[in-house]
């Protein structure tokens, strides 16, 4: 009998320990929030563009450009969606799934190369990681223009770079062109006042830059500041994938941004307003 009891009772402590181990999680600390995994710090990546970069014979009417990303995105700054040559009305857009659809309210010009730039416009939908930018080129003619020019726009008083200035090219060499019509090619400067104006014609241009107060891509002396190149300019560099100046840079990378080559330097100033006054009134006829 004793042997039977000694063999039976040692089971009880083991069973008790098993019960404690089963019910112990119910006493765990529940105040710690779940981590949810690592924070997403990567910007969106473009997977597809339609029409593809370099497409020719694009229709002048009803054209839209679709950028498809690897994740859901949002438009942070609509002004960052910039068409060159600019139209009277800015491009419109809508988000459709993981795609950004850009369309134009005006017909495109015939036999014209266009660039559509997204610098500073797009971020991912969850963490707000900014898309570094992308420029696509297409043409309504047979061949995409292939030249480019780089430069810096700065304040003439302190030589500080000017962000968001509009650099404009005109084939019309008259002084009045910048007052009356939009340019044949244009681009916005980045945070460092730097610009790379790509897919332009191999021809002679007048070069201007304006701080465009009302965003109409025409120089308004009462509102805008202006810079200009005092000589005619003809581009000498050809677009290709290996050109460092055509890449999109992280604006926080000071060394890389300041190391970019700049062909032109444009110093912005404000013109003094001039008013025509009637100094004297004389009656000369009967």
What are these regions (language model features)?
Residues 216:
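Acidic carboxylate motifs that coordinate Ca2+ or other divalent cations, activating on Asp/Glu
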Residues 219:
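An amphipathic, aromatic/His-enriched active-site/gating alpha helix that lines ligand/cofactor pockets
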Residues 3-11, 26-192, 196-199, 204-210, ...:
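Acidic, low-complexity Ser/Thr/Gly/Pro-rich repeat segments typical of extracellular/periplasmic
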Residues 12-25:
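Bacterial N-terminal signal peptides
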């Amino acid at each position: 009998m004793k042997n039977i009891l000694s063999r039976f009772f040692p089971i009880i402590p083991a069973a008790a320990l098993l019960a404690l181990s089963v019910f112990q999680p119910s006493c765990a600390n529940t105040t710690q929030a779940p981590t949810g995994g690592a924070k997403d710090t990567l910007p969106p990546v473009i997977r597809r563009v339609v029409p593809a970069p370099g497409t020719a014979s694009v229709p002048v009417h009803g054209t839209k450009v679709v950028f498809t990303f690897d994740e859901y995105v949002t438009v942070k700054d609509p002004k960052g969606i910039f068409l060159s040559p600019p139209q009277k009305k800015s491009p419109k857009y809508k988000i459709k799934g993981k795609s950004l659809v850009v369309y134009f309210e005006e017909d495109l010009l015939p036999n014209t190369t266009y660039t559509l730039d997204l610098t500073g416009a797009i971020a991912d939908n969850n963490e707000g990681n900014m898309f570094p930018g992308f420029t696509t080129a297409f043409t309504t003619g047979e061949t995409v223009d292939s030249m480019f020019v780089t430069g810096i726009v700065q304040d003439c008083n302190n030589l500080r770079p000017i962000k968001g200035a509009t650099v404009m090219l005109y084939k019309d060499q008259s002084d009045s062109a910048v007052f009356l019509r939009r340019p044949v090619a244009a681009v916005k400067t980045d945070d460092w006042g730097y610009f790379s104006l790509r897919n332009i014609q191999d021809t002679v241009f007048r070069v201007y830059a304006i701080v465009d107060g009302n965003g109409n891509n025409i120089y308004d002396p009462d509102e805008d500041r202006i810079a200009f190149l005092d000589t005619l300019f003809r581009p000498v560099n050809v677009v290709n994938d290996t050109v460092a100046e055509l890449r999109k840079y992280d604006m926080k990378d000071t060394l890389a941004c300041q190391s970019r080559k700049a062909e032109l330097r444009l110093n912005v100033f404000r013109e003094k307003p001039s008013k025509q006054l009637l100094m004297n009134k004389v009656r000369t006829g009967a």
